């Protein structure tokens, strides 16, 4: 997840991409058109442009059976994935302490608040103490819950936002990830103030505010995501209808890839929360009772909202179109800002096609369950460029801290879509140009600079291909 400062060019530039560190990258004239982004014309901001580049845009890359096998392999081989069904009925203190301690480590470097002021040591000490490590019991019963509202996952049980420098206000170091309505969790520990739970979800273990989780029996919790018939959200976001009768499911946001069961036997003509259902799908959502227990309530998902009664087929067309549904969305580190970061972005795209991925770039990049090309310092610039020019739609390109998804090639130049804080490239005057995109962005790959001496291609660490 790279960081850049802003600088926008309004006139064409010739970019020097034949860096001394990358002799294999042939010199090429790059212009900065009226988009202000290197090599990107207005037409290339339309998914139809990239779909039109494909000779077989509707070719099925992996069918339903192959995707199921891929997901099974992920759960079996990838240690970052948690199998909630395999958890024992009681948990040892060692197991729970291991989860919490791995994440909630006392900060050792200065941190700053939203106003750029240093966070006091006693304030940080109170945050660490609220993790309540000494209270972890041995043999506690494993409890399960469903998330009832999009919610943050945090490194500590606090809403305090902290930053590594006094001029950074976006990368909250206590923000880890996010969960969506219907996501299952195992509840394994409670904060000292009683307002937070430490939960284990299939892809991440972290702190979540209690008010976003409803606790129920394992069968109902773990079976919720397997119920049929169902709807899958295929837009960036979908919303249930407003209802004053049941505020818990009113205008509830459902993000791309969220799967919710349909109440197919709902009687025709019977109102749902005071409204006829013929213009909507009647879905069922988890809700939290006042005592924190799990219940379910019907809700209306309008036909106008983007959803399907099946996962989308894994095709080049769908990969491109799903990625572009986020185009321009504000970058949100760890799913903050009601958005997502680079790894969350690619995860949601693939989730809408039924494909599961690890949460973070560090785990995605090396997952043994995927079709991986590993790169090292021993790989020459020529080999790196060759690999880049062989990339296909949907391939995931990893550099330290960042991931991009390939959307096509133009004259041997790979283009990517990615959720990034900014882009850097070299101008005709030899100076670095920085564009603070701070959102989902389209760009060519090879002219992007990682630092003053290396390009993104130089720093590629892994390619992951969700294909045969």
Regions found by a protein language model. Name each.
Residues 178, 358-427:
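...with weaker cross-activation on analogous glycine-rich loops/strands in unrelated enzymes
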Residues 27-154, 160-164, 170, 186, ...:
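Boundary regions of SH3-family modules and the immediately adjacent low-complexity/disordered segments
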Residues 169-172, 244-247, 305-310, 328-337, ...:
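Second-shell loop/turn segments in exported
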Residues 144-147, 173-179, 248-251, 310-317, ...:
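Soluble non-cytosolic domains of exported or imported proteins
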Residues 180-185, 255-263, 393-397:
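Loop/turn positions that initiate beta-strands
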Residues 28-40, 47, 203, 211-232, ...:
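Aromatic- and glycine-rich peptidoglycan recognition patches
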Residues 333-353, 357-364:
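Active-site nucleophilic cysteine motif
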Residues 6-24:
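Gram-negative bacterial Sec-dependent N-terminal signal peptides
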């Amino acid at each position: 997840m790279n960081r850049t400062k802003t600088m926008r060019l309004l006139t064409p530039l010739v970019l020097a991409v034949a860096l001394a560190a990358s002799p294999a990258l042939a010199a090429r004239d790059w212009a900065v058109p009226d988009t202000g982004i290197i090599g990107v014309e207005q037409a290339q901001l339309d998914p139809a442009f990239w779909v039109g580049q494909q000779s077989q845009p509707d070719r099925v890359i992996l069918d339903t059976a192959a995707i199921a096998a891929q997901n099974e392999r992920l759960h079996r081989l990838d240690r970052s994935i948690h199998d909630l069904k395999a958890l024992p009925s009681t948990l040892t203190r060692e197991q729970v302490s291991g989860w919490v301690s791995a994440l909630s480590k006392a900060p050792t470097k200065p941190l700053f608040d939203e106003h750029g002021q240093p966070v006091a040591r006693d304030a940080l000490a109170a945050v660490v103490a609220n993790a309540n490590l000494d209270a972890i019991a041995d043999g506690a019963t494993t409890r399960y819950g469903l998330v009832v509202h999009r919610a943050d996952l945090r490194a500590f049980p606090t809403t305090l936002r902290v930053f590594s420098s006094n001029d950074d206000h976006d990368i909250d170091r206590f923000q880890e990830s996010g969960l969506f309505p219907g996501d299952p969790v195992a509840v394994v520990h409670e904060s000292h103030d009683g307002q937070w739970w430490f939960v284990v979800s299939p892809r991440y273990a972290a702190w979540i505010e209690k008010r976003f989780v409803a606790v129920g029996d394992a069968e109902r919790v773990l079976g919720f995501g397997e119920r049929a018939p169902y709807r899958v959200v295929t837009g960036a976001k979908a919303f249930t209808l407003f209802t004053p009768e049941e505020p818990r499911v009113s205008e509830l946001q459902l993000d791309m890839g969220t799967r919710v069961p349909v109440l197919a036997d709902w009687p025709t003509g019977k109102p749902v929360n005071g409204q006829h259902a013929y213009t909507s799908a009647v879905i069922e959502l988890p809700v939290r009772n006042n005592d924190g227990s799990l219940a379910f309530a019907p809700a209306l998902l309008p036909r106008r909202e983007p959803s399907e009664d099946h996962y989308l087929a894994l095709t080049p067309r769908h990969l491109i179109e799903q990625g572009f549904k986020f185009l321009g969305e504000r970058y949100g580190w760890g799913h903050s800002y009601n958005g997502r970061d680079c790894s969350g972005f690619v995860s949601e795209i693939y989730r809408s096609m039924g494909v599961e991925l690890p949460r973070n770039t560090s785990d995605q990049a090396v997952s043994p369950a995927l079709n991986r090309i590993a790169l090292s310092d021993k790989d020459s610039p020529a080999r790196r460029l060759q690999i880049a020019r062989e990339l296909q739609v949907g391939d995931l390109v990893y550099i330290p801290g960042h991931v991009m998804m390939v959307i096509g090639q133009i004259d041997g130049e790979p283009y990517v879509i990615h959720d990034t804080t900014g882009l850097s490239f070299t101008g005709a005057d030899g100076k670095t140009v920085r564009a603070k995109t701070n959102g989902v962005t389209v760009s060519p790959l090879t002219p992007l600079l990682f630092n003053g001496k290396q390009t993104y291609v130089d720093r590629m660490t892994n390619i992951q291909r969700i294909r045969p």
